[in-house]
């Protein structure tokens, strides 16, 4: 009888083509997502070597990072480098026979939102993209992670990837989430617990009652930020919630093929007694709404907490780093988080740009008005999310409250398009990174859930969503 295996072990074993004595492995790749920023050199490499894309049907391309999200984006992209990258992806996709969603296609959106929407992302698959947040797709019980541009070329040419196997980590989140606490708060709490290097060398499996109770949107939020915890990938075993989400998606199996697929997908779970190299446990019932205070995703506290004092940190290097973060963020130790005023609010990104996130925002802001001191924007994660939100009348709620309702794209998550912070501006953001300059030169980012961001937009400062009315 074979030894018990983790979910990661099973997917790895199913895709192992070859293993060398030093542990170097060749893995088969089921799905390859491509965007405009990390693919131009890869396609040029194919062109120069006279190669074709080995499996165009397993490759999907979309523009997301550079595209404007303003209503007039049909007028074109102002920045020359961004425009060239977008134009080049369209040309490369046509030349190499890869399906492509342009900015004028309603299926266009952030790469990690459109994959699941289209049924391109399925349980048990290996999925790669030249983007660190590819871990999002692990919410379906797939092994998904980012790759570099040279690896993008390798996958395009061979449909394989050279890898070494990571270690297994289990993050067990039991208990029931309190009202007002979301998947975003769970993952920020996890990163606060293990640190941004805590997952280095691991693939994380998320399990427990709180994880099981999440929708697919919530699970994608969790897996999306695995990389911020240092992990190679994050995954959640598929279940009935997963199967229901997949049913009816354009590229998902249908009929008997779907039933056969579900029978296989039900085997995709860690065996009882499977070995994890590290286990981390959290009690969801004790989690508060969380706000980041520094320039790392591990710099988090309860919304009812205060800005911490770095002098209480023993490690000299870390202490200096946290003082630098406070200086950059313009904050002082001891400041209550609810006393921090904000200038901007960004709701969107591959972390929190889905329909469930937008519904949560609408519930908070309906009948209210954005503070006069705040500029707030909502960017749907895809054209289909935008279409659904408008069908439900959410856009009317947002506009009536004073939010800017935008076109789909990565937007202000990263300063690679027109949406960015000005120096010194402070933003409540539903995105995944609060690094220095991430949202714009000298911009200050606080990571929060969609509901927390929405409430901050109305109040003009951070508030405890649990006390919101």
Swiss-Prot record:
InterPro entries: 3-IsopropMal_deHydase_lsu, Acnase/IPM_dHydase_lsu_aba_1/3, Acoase/IPM_deHydtase_lsu_aba, Aconitase_4Fe-4S_BS, Aconitase_4Fe-4S_dom, IPM_dehydratase_rel_enz, IPMI_cat. Pathway: Amino-acid biosynthesis; L-leucine biosynthesis; L-leucine from 3-methyl-2-oxobutanoate: step 2/4. Binds 1 [4Fe-4S] cluster per subunit. It comes from the Bacteria. Its cofactor is [4Fe-4S] cluster. The keyword 4Fe-4S applies. Its EC number is 4.2.1.33. PROSITE patterns: ACONITASE_1, ACONITASE_2. Gene3D superfamilies: Aconitase, domain 3. Keywords: 4Fe-4S, Amino-acid biosynthesis, Branched-chain amino acid biosynthesis, Iron, Iron-sulfur, Leucine biosynthesis, Lyase, Metal-binding. [4Fe-4S] cluster binds at residues 350, 410, 413. GO terms for biological process: L-leucine biosynthetic process. GO terms for molecular function: 3-isopropylmalate dehydratase activity; 4 iron, 4 sulfur cluster binding; metal ion binding. It catalyses: (2R,3S)-3-isopropylmalate = (2S)-2-isopropylmalate. HAMAP family: LeuC_type1. Catalyzes the isomerization between 2-isopropylmalate and 3-isopropylmalate, via the formation of 2-isopropylmaleate. Belongs to the aconitase/IPM isomerase family. LeuC type 1 subfamily. Heterodimer of LeuC and LeuD. This is 3-isopropylmalate dehydratase large subunit. It comes from Rhizobium etli (strain CIAT 652).
């Amino acid at each position: 009888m074979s030894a018990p295996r983790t979910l990661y072990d099973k997917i790895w074993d199913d895709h192992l083509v070859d293993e060398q004595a030093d542990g170097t492995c060749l893995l088969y790749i089921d799905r390859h997502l491509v965007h405009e920023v990390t693919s131009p050199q890869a396609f040029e490499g194919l062109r120069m070597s006279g190669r074709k894309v080995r499996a165009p049907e397993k490759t999907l391309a979309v523009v997301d990072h550079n595209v404007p999200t303003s209503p007039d984006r049909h007028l074109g992209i102002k920045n020359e480098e961004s425009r060239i990258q977008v134009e080049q992806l369209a040309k490369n996709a046509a030349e190499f026979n890869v399906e492509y969603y342009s900015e004028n296609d309603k299926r266009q959106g952030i790469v990690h939102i459109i994959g699941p929407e289209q049924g391109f992302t399925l349980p048990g698959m290996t999925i790669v993209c030249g983007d660190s947040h590819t871990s999002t797709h692990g919410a379906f019980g797939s092994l998904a992670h980012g790759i570099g541009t040279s690896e993008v070329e390798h996958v395009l040419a061979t449909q394989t990837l050279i890898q070494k196997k990571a270690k297994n980590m289990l993050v067990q989140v039991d208990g029931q989430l309190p009202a007002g606490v979301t998947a975003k708060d769970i993952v920020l709490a996890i990163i606060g617990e293990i640190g941004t290097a805590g997952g280095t060398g691991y693939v994380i499996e998320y399990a427990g009652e709180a994880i099981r109770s999440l929708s697919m949107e919530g699970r994608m939020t969790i897996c999306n930020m695995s990389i911020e915890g240092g992990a190679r990938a994050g995954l959640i075993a598929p279940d009935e919630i997963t199967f229901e989400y997949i049913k009816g998606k354009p590229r998902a199996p249908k009929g008997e093929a779907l039933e056969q697929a579900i029978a296989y997908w039900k085997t995709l779970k860690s065996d009882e007694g499977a070995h994890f190299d590290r286990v981390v446990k959290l009690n969801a019932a004790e989690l508060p709404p969380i706000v980041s205070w520094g320039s790392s995703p591990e710099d988090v506290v309860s919304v009812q907490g205060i800005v911490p004092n770095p002098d209480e940190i023993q490690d000299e290097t870390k202490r200096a780093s946290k003082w630098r973060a406070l200086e950059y963020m313009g904050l002082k130790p001891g400041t209550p988080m609810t006393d921090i005023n904000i200038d901007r609010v960004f709701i969107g990104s591959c972390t929190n740009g889905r329909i469930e996130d937008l519904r949560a925002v609408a519930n908070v802001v309906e009948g209210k008005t954005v503070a006069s001191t705040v500029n707030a924007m909502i960017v749907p994660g895809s054209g289909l999310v935008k279409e659904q939100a408008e069908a439900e009348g959410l856009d009317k709620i947002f506009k009536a409250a004073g939010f800017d309702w935008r076109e789909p794209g990565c937007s202000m998550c990263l300063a690679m398009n027109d949406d960015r912070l000005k120096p010194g501006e402070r933003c409540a953001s539903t995105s995944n990174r609060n690094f220095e300059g991430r949202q714009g030169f000298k911009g200050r980012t606080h990571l929060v859930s969609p509901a927390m961001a929405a409430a901050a937009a109305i109040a003009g400062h951070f508030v405890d969503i649990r006390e919101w009315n």
